[in-house]
Amino acid sequence: MKKIAILGSTGSIGTQTLSVIEEHADDFEVTALACGNNIRLLEEQMRKFRPKLVAVWSKEAAASLRVRTADLGIPVETGMDGLLAVATYEESEILVTAIVGMLGIRPTIAAIKAKKTIALANKETLVTAGHLIIPLAAEYGVSILPVDSEHSAIFQSLQGNEENPISKILLTASGGPFRGRKKQDLLHIQVEDALKHPNWSMGHKVTIDSSTLVNKGLEVMEAKWLFGVELEQIEVVVHPQSVIHSAVEYEDGAVIAQLGTPDMRLPIQYALYYPKRKHLSGKRLDLFALCDLTFERPDTDTFRGLSLAYDAARRGGNI
């Protein structure tokens, strides 16, 4: 039985991770959970999964949660100290980093030093501190398993070919809700329009960033660090159907890709069970039902966030 801790348990990735764990309750135990301040949902998770430690960000939320869950006897920590306690909880084997932003850097570093396997959904950790995280993981012999669907697809496409040089990574993008529009078409869009992703169910920040291709730019940086490739070896391909989640082209011209339905539980479960696979409920990919698979070059004139991300990655450093 693998023992799992989750940073960001009440967010999109966190709740889907717990869904996978619930489906395979005989294989996993939840040891520690952390969230922002959504104590109502965290309380539900505490009562269902019975972790041995939880953390919330604010002292006020923690005080309220302690009262609400006094009958459980589960310690409630706060702030960065709480995140670090969850990240390094002694009994945990895998840490799922599903919080948003640079807040994930310190807990990830601490977890690596505590020799926890990292299931990485917090791309900002590598975007801003990949030059620290990757060498540190190598030093401590810690695996970093990608949870982002695209990076999981690349990771899976590399299995069994680790010694074979690659030509390039084909990083797919759906194009978001505004694919095909030009600058003048985007002057009066509303937040609710940007939150209507055509294929994926994700948190609000990632969904907004996907609508501008900024998220894809961050994924380019993440791929650079995860797979040790040059920026010139990462090619973004707009693939509106989101069936091919990404691919790797090898030096001989062969392309190996990972296909599947747009369900984040797939890469989550792959990371939790790695290197094994296990049955997962849900819709299967039906090749006969697919009308077509199409591919386009990204419109970097309209969606400048992607080209800006490449420029930032070339310069390196932080602002």
Q: Where are the predicted features?
A:
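Catalytic, metal-anchored helix/loop core of enzyme active sites in primary metabolism
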Residues: 1-319
